[in-house]
């Protein structure tokens, strides 16, 4: 399977499995997991070593499965994501919600079955490392932080 550092797994509304991978400096990935696919680590990476030298891997290799999204140039330090399937935020139906240590909560519009485009940044003003997001029974979001004063946050429209 060749995955570097799985940060989170989630299923989308079609039952497909997605993996968020914490890459080396830069190069965090979102992968759609398919049986028998090779995601390339350590031979393929978009990131670089922490001393800013290029990583061993190359960008693309025939036969390897490329990520759906790659986060460059800096790392997001992604957490456990969720695809939104609630009612509280109807415009987000099917969108990917991705918590991050460094960028808050990212919302990716899902078009053609895959998240893409530029994310909307949410909760960045909290200055907290976001670890996980889950969708509650009424569509509210529950976001877990992991600082020493960590908390479980409930996010509803207007909050």
List where the protein language model places each region.
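Beta-propeller domain segments
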Residues: 4-120, 128, 138, 150-151, ...
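Flexible gly/pro/ser-rich segments immediately N-terminal to CXXCH heme-c attachment motifs
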Residues: 124
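Repeated scaffold domains used in trafficking and secretory/extracellular systems
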Residues: 130-132
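Short, exposed beta-strand-loop hairpins at the edges of beta-sheets
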Residues: 141-146
């Amino acid at each position: 399977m060749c995955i570097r550092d799985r940060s989170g797994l989630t299923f989308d509304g079609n039952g497909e499995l997605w993996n968020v991978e914490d890459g080396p400096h830069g190069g965090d990935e979102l992968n759609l997991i398919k049986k028998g696919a090779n995601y390339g680590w350590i031979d393929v990476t978009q990131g670089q070593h922490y001393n800013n030298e290029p990583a061993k891997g190359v960008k693309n290799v025939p036969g390897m499965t490329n990520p759906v999204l790659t986060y460059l140039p800096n790392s997001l330090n992604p957490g456990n994501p969720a695809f939104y399937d609630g009612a509280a935020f109807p415009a987000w139906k099917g969108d990917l919600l991705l918590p991050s240590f460094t960028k808050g909560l990212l919302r990716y519009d899902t078009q053609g079955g895959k998240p893409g485009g530029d994310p909307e940044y949410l909760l960045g003003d909290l200055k907290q490392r976001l670890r996980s997001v889950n969708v509650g029974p009424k569509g509210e979001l529950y976001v877990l932080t992991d600082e020493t004063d960590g908390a479980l946050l409930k996010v509803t429209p207007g909050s």
